[in-house]
Amino acid sequence: MTRAKGAAMRRIHVGNALSAFGLGFTVPYLYVYVAQVRGLGAMTAGLVLAVFAVAALIVLPFAGRAIVRRGPLPVLLAALVTAAVGALGLGLAGTATAVLTASAALGAGQAVMQPALATMIVDCSTTETRSRAFAMQFFLQNLGLGVGGLIGGHLVDATRVSSFTLLFSIEAAMFLLLAVVMATVRVPSAPRVGDAPRQSARGAWRQLLGNRAMVQLSVLGFVLFFACYGQFESGLSAYGVEAVGISTSALGTALAANTAMIVVAQFAVLRFVERQKRSRVIAAVGLLWAVAWVVAGYAGLGHGSQEMATAAFVSTYALFGLGEAMLSPTVAPLVADLAPSGMAGQYNSAFALVKQLALAVGPAVGGPMGASLHAPYIVTFLLFSLGITYLALRLGRQLTAVQDQPWLARNRVVAKGGAAVGPVAAEAQA
C-alpha cells in the first residue's frame, strides 16, 4: 500500500468511527423519543423504523450507479449532508409528518454511506490488505456505537425534550464533521466519470446478475443478515423477555457482551481468518451460530435456574459477536473481489440492498415467533444457521483460488520476483 493510500485509509477509518459514534447517540433511544417524549404514540414510532428501511430500499439501487459514474467521495458527501439534515430535523420535529420526513432523509443518507465508504476502502486497499481494512472498519463501527450509546444514555432525560434535541444535534454535527474529514481524502485509484463503464443501469444490473458467484453470495448474505442481525433487537430480544424471563438490564448486558466480544476478539480472529479459505470461514460461522441457537434454546426451554438461563442468553449474544468478528474481514472483501474493475460501487450497493431487505424481513418474521412460538423459533433459526454452512460451501465451488484465498495473489507475485502478472489480476476479478 502506498503512503497516499495509507493516509487516505486512516482518514476513512476516522470517518467510520465518527459516523458510528453519532449513530450510537440516538439509535437506542429513537423509539422512546418518538412514542413518549414527543407523544406521537407507538404507531408513529413503528412507522419511523419502517421509513428508515423503505428509504434505504429506494435509494440503494441508484446509489451504486452514482458511485460508479461519479466516484464514492461525492456520493458520500451528499449522503452525509442528507443524513445531517435528517438528524437535525428529528431533533426539532414536533409532528408526525415532520418526524417521518426527517426519518426518510436520515435513513436514505445512512444507507448510502455504507457502500460509498466500502468502495473507498476498496480503492485504498489491495487484495491482500483488504481483509484487515474491513476488519478495522467493523471494529471502529462497534466501538463507536458502544461509546456513543454509553455517553448518550448519560445525557438523555426522558422528561426533557431538549436533551434529545441535543443528542440529535450531536449526531448531525458528527455527520458534518465526517464530511469535512472525508473532503480531504485523496484516493489515488478512485474511479472518474470518464473511466466508468459506459453501459446503461439495466446493463449494469444484468452484468451483476450474470455473475453466479455474486448471486450466490447475495443469497448467502440475505440468510446471514436475516438469521443474525435481523434478530438482535426483535425476535431474539422478544424471546429473551418472554421465554427466558430476563430483565431489560440483562438484555442490555447481552447487547454489551456482543459488542465487547467483537472489540476484544476482532484482531485475534483476523490472524486466523486471513490464512483460511473465505468460504470455509463463513461455513464455520454457520456452525458457530447453530451452537448459539442451541444455547438460546437451553436458556428459554431448559429447566435450569434463572441465573443459568440469563448467563446462557448473554452467552448467545457473545457467540453471535464472535461470528460477526469472523465475517467482517471475509464477506465485504469478497464482494469487492468479485466486482469487475470499476464496478465495486455497484456491487457494494447491491449487497447493501440485500442487507436492508434481510433486516426488514428478519424482524417481521422473527419478532412474533420469538414472542410466542418459542420452540419453533429456535428450531427455525438453528436450521437457517446450518443453511449458512451449506450455502458457504456451495459458494466455495464458484470462487477462483485467489477469490477464496486472497493471500495466494501475494505469494504468486513474490514467486515472480515482485511483478504482478496478468493471470493473477484476471483471476481476482473473474
Regions found by a protein language model. Give the residues of each.
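Helix-breaking motifs and short loop linkers at transmembrane-helix boundaries and internal kinks
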Residues: 39, 71, 92-97, 299-300
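Helix-loop boundary and gating motifs at the non-cytosolic
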Residues: 3-53, 215-255
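Cytoplasmic helix-loop-helix junction between adjacent transmembrane helices
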Residues: 102-141
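Helix-to-loop junctions at the C-terminal end of transmembrane segments
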Residues: 58-71, 156, 264-279, 370
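Structural signature of the two symmetry-related core transmembrane helices
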Residues: 74-89, 280-296
